[in-house]
From Swiss-Prot:
Key words of the record: Amino-acid biosynthesis, Aromatic amino acid biosynthesis, NADP, Oxidoreductase
Enzymatic reactions: shikimate + NADP(+) = 3-dehydroshikimate + NADPH + H(+)
Residues binding NADP(+), per UniProt: 77, 126-130, 149-154, 212, 237
GO BP, sorted A to Z: amino acid biosynthetic process; aromatic amino acid family biosynthetic process; chorismate biosynthetic process; shikimate metabolic process
Gene name of the encoded protein: aroE
Listed EC numbers: 1.1.1.25
Protein name as catalogued: Shikimate dehydrogenase (NADP(+))
Stored InterPro entries: Aminoacid_DH-like_N_sf, NAD(P)-bd_dom_sf, Shikimate_DH, Shikimate_DH-bd_N, Shikimate_DH_fam, Shikm_DH/Glu-tRNA_Rdtase
Source organism per UniProt: Actinobacillus pleuropneumoniae serotype 5b (strain L20)
Phylogenetic lineage: Bacteria, Pseudomonadati, Pseudomonadota, Gammaproteobacteria, Pasteurellales
Enzyme class of the recorded protein, top EC level: oxidoreductase
Length: 274
């Protein structure tokens, strides 16, 4: 039985063990997947011990993605650009391969929704790790990206780093209000404090609105605000979570699961748990 785990802090809320359990049942793969509360002081030692004991792979979530990145021996292109990994695989020779499947999870969910068309005007809110993890796949999909971040310098540095991969620029809230967008993505963690970026209402009304965070009935602070502004096309990040997990599962087990089927089951379980 192949051993896997997701590492984070906090981690009790993670849906990943359930998602991978469903993937295993669906594909007939014999796997064990557990949640591990990472120790801020000893994370690297704990993770390397996990692999030394024979584990085949691990998912990494906040706040350890950058630290896990530094432990790897080989990297995917998306992982190198993000400078953070959410997926590690132990290779046959014992070395660690690092990937970042967040962006592919996002793009696959946007495709499922019919929201990923070439040359769209996309506004991304935030310039932190979540944004870094998705820029490369979005630019590969020929999205025209504008980044807003409260600290403009951070957004500018990110835009400069990814400029050679496609159209990307930065803007202030005032500049954003004078533009039009086809898709608006919230990649900030403000929702964890019950806050959101106050994007101009007319933009939310006309665009498709996507929040990387998720909640039962899509009741995230940003999506609640978007609905109040008249948004009619909106979605939370549960599909992105299941999607990135699907790409990690494929990396480990060499079989891509039916993501949509698992997403539907997860939504039903969350609905029934209310």
């Amino acid at each position: 039985m192949n051993q896997y785990a997701v590492w984070g802090n906090p981690i009790a809320q993670s849906k990943s063990p359930r998602i991978h359990q469903l993937f295993g049942e669906q594909t007939g793969k014999s796997i064990s997947y557990v949640a591990k509360l990472g120790n801020e002081l000893n994370f690297e030692n704990e993770l390397m011990q996990f692999f030394a004991e024979g584990a085949k792979g691990a998912n990494i979530t906040a706040p350890f993605k950058e630290r896990a990145f530094s432990l790897a021996d080989e990297y995917s292109e998306s992982c190198l650009l993000a400078e953070a990994c959410n997926t590690l695989k132990r290779l046959d020779d014992g070395r660690l391969y690092a990937d970042n499947t967040d962006g592919f999870g996002l793009c696959s969910d946007l495709e499922r929704l019919g929201w990923l068309k070439p040359h769209q005007r996309v506004l991304i809110l935030g310039a932190g790790g979540a944004t870094k993890g998705v820029l490369f796949p979005l630019l590969k999909a020929k999205q025209q990206i504008t980044i807003y971040n409260r600290t403009l310098e951070k957004a500018v540095r990110l835009a400069e780093k990814f400029a050679k991969y496609g159209k990307i620029r930065t803007a202030s809230l005032e500049q954003i209000a004078e533009q039009q967008f086809d898709l608006i993505i919230n990649a900030t963690s403000l929702g964890l404090q019950g806050k959101y970026v106050p994007v101009a209402a007319h933009l939310l009304k006309s665009a498709a609105v996507y929040d990387m965070q998720y909640a039962p009935d899509m009741q995230t602070p940003f999506l609640n605000y978007a609905r109040e502004c008249g948004a009619v096309r909106y979605q939370d990040g549960l599909g992105m979570l299941v999607g990135q997990a699907g790409f990690a599962f494929k990396l480990w087990e060499n079989e891509f699961p039916n993501v949509e089927k698992v997403l539907k089951q997860l939504k039903n379980e969350m609905e029934n748990a209310k």
